[in-house]
Amino acid sequence: MFSSKTEYDRGVNTFSPEGRIFQIEYAIEAIKLGSTSLGIQTPDAVIIAAEKRVPSTLVDPSSVNKILEIDHHIGTVLSGMVADARILVDHARVEAQNHRFTYDEPMSVESCALATCDLSVQFGESGGRKKLMSRPFGVSLLIAGVDENGPQLWQTDPSGTYTRYDAQAIGGGAEAAQTVFSERYHRNMTVEEAENLTVQILRQVMEEKLTKTSVEIAIVPVSTGRLQIYDQEQIQRIIDRQAEEN
């Protein structure tokens, strides 16, 4: 039996007497140390965006990516440990392709979130067999896409929970971003309004100046049903438009 909180800290498969698994709680706290990412669902599209932190001038910015494609119609943006995210995203990609091959149809956005969370809970050791990870995944994903049910935005977290949102933010600036969402977001937003709100929030929560190279933005429109990651010129136009709006 564990006799102290410190010993419960080390156990990833054991609840404390208060009903808590501390390692999962610590993984959720680790996400708050990551850069801010957010997503907005509108009737015509779902938009995801992220703060892009380049740790050094010697780093090639093109190698730092927070928005990733899972399938043609699904993209994700992350906050937390990038290496952990890569494992989850690679798993989601394989599941999406297996679904397409087996059923001759694209995977639903919710099923993609579920597949990701199925892997999220495969940590620790049990029955003498080592799991994929010895600890919880220290990353949260916002999974955005369009399927037969329209545009959708889902969040996953280290506990294996997945939840659908109209608008959501994760990472260091999540609390401030969610305050703005509660004041400015409405379900009938146009794509242009959602883009402007995205830039406005990132401008407020980022420590560095917001530029076309310091953020990433992507969209999955209902009209095409395909993920489109904006280039720097498109991002600059949104930044300029939002500045004029203010």
Swiss-Prot record:
It is found in: Cytoplasm; Nucleus. Signal peptide: none annotated. Keywords: Cytoplasm, Nucleus, Proteasome. One of its GO terms (cellular component) is nucleus. CDD domains: proteasome_alpha_type_5. It comes from the Eukaryota. GO terms for biological process: proteasome-mediated ubiquitin-dependent protein catabolic process; ubiquitin-dependent protein catabolic process. Its main location: cytoplasm. Gene3D superfamilies: Glutamine Phosphoribosylpyrophosphate, subunit 1, domain 1 (3.60.20.10). The proteasome is a multicatalytic proteinase complex which is characterized by its ability to cleave peptides with Arg, Phe, Tyr, Leu, and Glu adjacent to the leaving group at neutral or slightly basic pH. The proteasome has an ATP-dependent proteolytic activity. Belongs to the peptidase T1A family. The 26S proteasome consists of a 20S proteasome core and two 19S regulatory subunits. The 20S proteasome core is composed of 28 subunits that are arranged in four stacked rings, resulting in a barrel-shaped structure. The two end rings are each formed by seven alpha subunits, and the two central rings are each formed by seven beta subunits. The catalytic chamber with the active sites is on the inside of the barrel. PANTHER family: PROTEASOME SUBUNIT ALPHA/BETA. This is Proteasome subunit alpha type-5.
